[in-house]
Amino acid sequence: KTGRMSDSTPAAPVVLDLWCDLECPDCHRALDDVRALRARYGDRVEIRLRHFPLEKHKHAFAAAQAAEEAVAQGRGWPYIEALLSRTDDLGRTGEPVLLDVARELGLDTEEFDTALIDGRHLLIVDADHAEGKAIGVTGTPTYVIGDERLDGGKSQEGLRERIEEIVDRTLAARDR
């Protein structure tokens, strides 16, 4: 187990990595696409959240660590979705929002606080960020399917349709 946040079974035939900054308003808007992709493909597509905290968002790195603690407590995606719906609060109020969201979801906030202090999830966040840089991720959200990278940080326009084309083509090739 890698600790990665995934919304499907490991045997899913198509992997979609979503490189995300949890303080990024564009990543919040990308959730609609994620929900639509889940509805359309179900477990035929594994959507994995990958951390790419941007320097301009001062709470994004802590938010990524908090998200990994939510994964450890079994509520990764609900936490991510709740936190992304509060990007303005996070930017304005800072790290207390991370614990507020955990509390609202019934997670162990003491363990959250401890995880943020002891840095137990730093390696996952650092590894994601390094891998993202290595493959050319520069902004968020960025989607990667196989060797195709789609930058949603510049524009969300038509992005879901392009993702669906790639997924459909990949699934068709595997079904032959």
Predicted regions and their residues:
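Structural alpha/beta surface segment adjacent to cysteine/selenocysteine redox centers
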Residues: 15-103, 173-174
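Context-gated lysine
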Residues: 1, 56-58, 133, 154
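C-terminal cap of thioredoxin/glutaredoxin-like
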Residues: 13, 19, 26-39, 100-176
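A short beta-strand-turn-helix
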Residues: 1-15
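Generic serine detector
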Residues: 6-8, 85, 155
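Short clusters of hydrophobic/aromatic residues that line enzyme substrate/ligand-binding pockets
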Residues: 7, 90, 150
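A general structural-boundary detector
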Residues: 11, 53, 66, 85-88, ...
